[in-house]
Amino acid sequence: MKTTNLPFNEQAVLFAGLLAAILGNGCVTPTVGSPDLFNGKDLDGWQVTDFAGGGKIEVKDGEIHIAMGELISGINLAHQNIPRTNYELSAEAIKLDGNDFFCGLTFPVGDTFASFIPGGWGGTVVGISSIDGMDAAENETATFKKFDNNRWYRFRVRVTPSKVQCWVDDEMAVDLLLEDRAIALRPGPIELSVPIGITAFQTVARIRNIRLQPIKP
């Protein structure tokens, strides 16, 4: 069988075309061959979310440093070139000070959005906001976990047409069936955190290794 060796740039174009054909319009990885949403150097592809009283945000040593704000602080993706379903979103975060959530993840669920809140409502509530008009402290996804300061945690969200699943490290925290459920963001400033956002509430946090990976249906 005869093989054809294409120049590197032609191979890259061919691979990108195949990937787009497989995933469909609007459902491509952030960069060809890489699931990374954060380059470790600057906020390229992101913007500081315009939260009133938000803390200072800067990139140092391969991490996003979020200073404590009056209420909520964070960043959101500055483009819409992301999957809406059949994907995994993950990030690692550490809380240095404060007593509330330090890596809220806002993400698309089909045509709407939701937020995974680890350590909200005083530091221990874990869950999804919002489901059928109820936030993470009120709906059936609410669980309770103590988050230690000065320790890195890995948070992961998986979205398919039928489910939203979330993990804290390797422990599943949410396993939500979507059929006949009304999914939406909690009304308020978190609505600025789309299409993908990372937030901290009155905490000092650092974020690294933000990744978005399409998964097979």
Roles of regions detected by a PLM:
Residues 2-15:
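Bacterial N-terminal signal peptides that target proteins for export
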Residues 4-6, 20, 145:
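A subset of signal/propeptide-processing and intrinsically disordered low-complexity segments
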Residues 15-25:
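Bacterial N-terminal signal peptides
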Residues 27-217:
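Carbohydrate-interacting regions of secretory-pathway proteins
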